[in-house]
């Protein structure tokens, strides 16, 4: 049974008192006092460097909406001007005034407006990636420069497949490719990069290029032996790593030719063309009878039997795109070799070494070893520096391979390593400013510093580059590697005009994507004070959130939390428990200024937690060994905090997360170790589900923000445990007695502190499925009102014996998207008989909280909910003793809406406090008494834009009060 107790409330610096209870009502993360800029920081007459972020995004509340709207309008005006007055201004118009007056034109225009308005309404239920509440996938708000660049170029609809179809945006893509290569540490003149629709395409292309490079020496050897046109190069020599010296290519064994180093192979076409005097196209025409990509896999394998089991090596955490790559390229899914990961979900270099030993012994060629620079689930960066060392040592043994870095997620973190160019408009900062930023851990720094030694790198501007889809990219250390794709045999695009359709998988692709990335790069900058600043502030948020999850459970809770990446076993001789104490004492609840001054705490933050912004965790019950129960709890958390295709609107999801599962791998101890930490049975191979909380939010830097996330997550965990473990029961909902024109009625749950099934505070809207039943209900309610001004309320009791969660959110056992209720006058007893039974649909659940306090609040708190016709207050119970109460207000209080939507907050539901009433109930004869002695009270609440509001509530009718039922 879950006992009533308090939620973890952090101390606000300097406040000295506990925060008021929050849960998922009107969170303080939007209080106006939480300014991004402190007054003292702006008083110097210049912005600190971190203030630039304010101009890079529209803002979670569209704070830069006016600026964005103005720039979009100017962008559209510029395009209209181009069409009208710049491009052949003497051309006559087609859409004339007469045409616009035609009925068909007007009908089409009206249809356009109607459908667009419908689309706009539908899109408002989309996932709110831009919100500080969003902690799900590796996706967040789009940088304003990127959005504006996309919109500007979109109007011109350029196709970057061919230069003549995209004269401007092709050059943009070339510029972007170069900039990304430089950010990754490649030499500007030797490297190349280009955009693709996403990381999947980039990864496939990288393996495609690596495979073709791997097999090229075999084809060339055969051609040198057979082709008269290549006779002048018959004695062509290459360096054989295993021999440690030069030798004739024609004299190399098949195994030796499959293990030449990449740079030697990339030089072969140029060398042979120089020795033979052939043009590149002529040489490739000769080679077409020998290349894998020309003659096909069966014939090439017949000629070169060793290639039959050629494989690609990836960590077990690798993206599914590599499975697609080996399938599409004909290598076969069975030849995708997965390396086990360690307890930090990083590729285990010891296991990789064993695999390399086995492949060397069995003479199985390896096309490439893939290092993931930031998994999007576990947030881990593979030990690239060790992988590079292994290649160096195994090359000398006769086993060589390309190395591809999948930096789709983590690639942009290299911006944190790059200094700001002196020509940039922002001067280098004198100090770090008000908002702290956490740079890369020593381990991550080492790995990202080594990516410039990889042959290819995938990087996605539409992930950590905050650009719109589709915008992935692939960078080549040596631009010559791209020509081995052999898409065209006639042109080598080393510089000058490039037909981008000839350098990758894709043909048509939007020039708008290139414009978006280019403008973002130019405005923000691919350096420490551009993207590096954004990501370092996000890193600060991620480390704090990691600390929050580590310390969220309290000693007397019945649940534990384990992060997928554990705390260090030791840090400066501190045990894990001592580290948790350090987190609680010196990190959680501290202001940005306090943390920035605590060098040891900041050093600790830098080294712990996720490699790349994604803290993950699993919740389990104490003493629970069942993986199924653990997974069910975490699935319930995910379902509560995620969007679905159902009817639940976006504002009913107080925080958005996602989830995945840690899977078994025969050579990995990661799952077993994770199960041990969770107290689960680790003898089987069943996967364990975990919650993913991605931190791509540079705004999340206030104490209040983390308090609110803690409250939301804690309530979600308790409700999820209840979903799985609550004993089944019938549930009573007290009616407000008011049915609107659409047959909807608001109800209040009759919770109980002592009954594990009913330890909830809940308000919901139900809808009668039948007009007849709604009419019968209203007639009964009217009859009751005629007998008394405060009659017993009508109570809906669920007929199904189930959990409260399943009544409100589960699939109906009746199969008609509704629940069945019996209707009683007053709370039913064992002797009560229902006066009718109804089928009702649960339309809205604005409040669903598990009791979790051991102290009453300072002031009495109510949940205000309703619509423009009826407003109600529902008392929020906290701890025993307390009471249940419903009152109807005589009017909508001021401050709960806007001019366009006067009942906005009322429809959402908000917590209000009445300062004149103590949060502790008045006890008379051992029972709480009704505190509402007057008809009018002052009330406070968090209003629109986080402004603290004061209003007056006037009571029209007291519907229900009970100080007994909830306590016994």
Map each language-model feature to its residues.
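Glycine- and acidic
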Residues: 154-164, 187-195, 304-309, 334-341, ...
């Amino acid at each position: 049974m879950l006992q009533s107790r308090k939620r973890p409330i952090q101390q606000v610096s300097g406040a000295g008192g506990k925060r008021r209870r929050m849960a998922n009502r009107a969170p303080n993360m939007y209080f106006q006092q939480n300014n991004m800029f402190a007054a003292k920081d702006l008083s110097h007459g210049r912005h600190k460097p971190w203030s630039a972020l304010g101009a890079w995004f529209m803002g979670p509340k569209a704070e830069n909406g006016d600026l964005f709207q103005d720039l979009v309008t100017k962008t559209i005006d510029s395009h209209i001007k181009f069409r009208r007055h710049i491009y052949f201004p003497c051309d006559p118009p087609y859409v004339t005034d007469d045409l616009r007056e035609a009925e068909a034109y007007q009908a089409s225009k009206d249809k356009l407006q109607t459908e667009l308005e419908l689309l706009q309404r539908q899109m408002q239920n989309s996932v709110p990636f831009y919100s500080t509440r969003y902690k799900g996938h590796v996706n967040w708000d789009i940088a304003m420069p990127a959005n504006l660049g996309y919109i500007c170029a979109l109007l011109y609809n350029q196709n970057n497949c061919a230069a003549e179809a995209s004269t401007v945006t092709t050059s943009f893509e070339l510029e972007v490719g170069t900039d990304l290569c430089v950010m990754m540490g490649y030499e500007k003149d030797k490297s190349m990069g280009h955009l693709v629709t996403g990381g999947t395409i980039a990864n496939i292309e990288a393996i495609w290029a690596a495979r073709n490079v791997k097999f090229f020496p075999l084809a060339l050897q055969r051609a040198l032996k057979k082709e008269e046109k290549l006779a002048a190069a018959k004695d062509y020599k290459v360096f054989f790593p295993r021999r440690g010296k030069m030798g004739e290519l024609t004299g190399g064994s098949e195994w030796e030719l499959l293990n030449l180093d990449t740079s030697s192979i990339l030089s072969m076409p140029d060398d042979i063309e120089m020795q033979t005097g052939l043009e590149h196209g002529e040489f490739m025409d000769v080679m077409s009878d020998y290349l894998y990509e020309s003659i096909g896999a069966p014939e090439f394998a017949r000629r070169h039997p060793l290639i039959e089991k050629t494989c690609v090596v990836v960590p077990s955490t690798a993206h599914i795109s590599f499975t697609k790559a080996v399938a599409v390229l004909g290598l076969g899914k069975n030849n995708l070799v997965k390396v086990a990961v360690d307890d930090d979900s990083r590729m285990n270099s010891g296991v990789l070494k064993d695999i390399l030993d086995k492949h060397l012994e069995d003479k199985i060629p390896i096309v490439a070893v893939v290092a993931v620079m930031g998994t999007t689930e576990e947030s881990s960066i593979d030990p690239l520096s060790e992988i590079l060392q292994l290649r160096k040592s195994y090359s000398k043994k006769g086993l060589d391979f390309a190395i591809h870095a999948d930096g789709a997620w983590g690639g942009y973190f290299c911006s944190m390593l790059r200094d700001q160019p002196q020509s940039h408009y922002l001067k280098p900062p004198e100090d770090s400013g008000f908002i702290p930023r956490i740079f890369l851990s020593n381990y991550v720094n080492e790995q990202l510093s080594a990516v410039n030694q990889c042959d290819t790198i995938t990087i996605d501007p539409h992930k950590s580059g905050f650009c719109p889809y589709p915008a992935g990219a692939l960078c080549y250390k040596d631009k010559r590697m791209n020509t081995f794709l052999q898409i065209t045999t006639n042109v080598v695009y080393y510089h000058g005009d490039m037909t981008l359709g000839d350098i990758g998988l894709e043909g048509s692709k939007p020039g708008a994507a290139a414009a978006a990335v280019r403008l973002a790069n130019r405005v923000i900058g691919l350096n420490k004070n551009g993207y590096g600043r954004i990501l370092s502030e996000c890193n600060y948020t991620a480390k704090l959130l990691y600390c929050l999850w580590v310390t969220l459970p309290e000693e007397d809770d019945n649940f534990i939390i384990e992060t997928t990446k554990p705390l260090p076993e030791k840090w400066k001789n501190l045990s894990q428990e001592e580290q948790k104490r350090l987190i609680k004492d010196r990190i959680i609840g501290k202001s940005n200024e306090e943390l920035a001054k605590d060098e040891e705490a900041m050093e600790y933050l830098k080294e712990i937690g996720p490699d790349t912004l994604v803290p993950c965790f699993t919740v389990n019950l104490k003493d629970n060994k069942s993986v199924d129960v653990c997974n069910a709890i975490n699935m319930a958390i995910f379902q509560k905090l995620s969007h679905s295709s159902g009817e639940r609107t976006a504002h009913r999801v107080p925080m958005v997360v996602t989830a995945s599962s840690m899977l078994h791998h025969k050579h990995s101890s990661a799952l077993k170790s994770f199960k041990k930490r969770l107290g689960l049975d680790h003898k089987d191979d069943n996967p364990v589900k975990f919650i993913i909380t991605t931190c791509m939010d540079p705004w999340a830097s206030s104490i209040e923000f983390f308090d609110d996330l803690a409250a939301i997550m804690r309530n979600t965990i308790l409700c999820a445990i209840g979903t799985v473990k609550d004993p089944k029961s019938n549930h009573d909902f007290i009616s407000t007695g008011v049915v609107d024109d659409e047959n909807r009625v608001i109800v209040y749950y009759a919770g109980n502190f002592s009954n594990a099934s009913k330890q909830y505070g809940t308000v919901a809207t139900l809808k009668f499925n039948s007009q007849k039943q709604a009419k019968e209900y209203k007639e009964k309610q009217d009859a009751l009102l005629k007998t008394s001004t405060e009659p017993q309320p009508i109570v809906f009791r669920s007929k199904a014996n189930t959990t409260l969660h399943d009544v409100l959110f589960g699939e109906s056992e009746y199969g008609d998207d509704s629940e069945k209720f019996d209707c009683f006058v007053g709370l039913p007893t064992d002797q009560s008989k229902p006066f009718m039974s109804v089928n009702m649909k649960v339309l809205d659940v604005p409040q669903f909280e598990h009791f979790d306090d051991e102290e009453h609040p300072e002031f009495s708190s109510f949940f205000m909910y309703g619509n423009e016709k009826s407003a109600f207050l529902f008392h929020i119970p906290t701890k025993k003793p307390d009471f249940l109460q419903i009152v109807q207000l005589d009017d909508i209080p001021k401050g709960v809406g806007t001019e366009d939507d006067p009942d906005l907050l009322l429809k959402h539901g908000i917590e209000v406090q009445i300062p004149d009433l103590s949060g502790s109930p008045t006890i008379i004869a051992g029972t709480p008494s009704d505190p509402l002695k007057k008809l009018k009270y002052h009330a406070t609440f968090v209003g629109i834009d986080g402004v603290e509001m004061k209003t007056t509530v006037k009571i029209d009718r007291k519907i229900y009060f009970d100080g007994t039922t909830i306590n016994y």
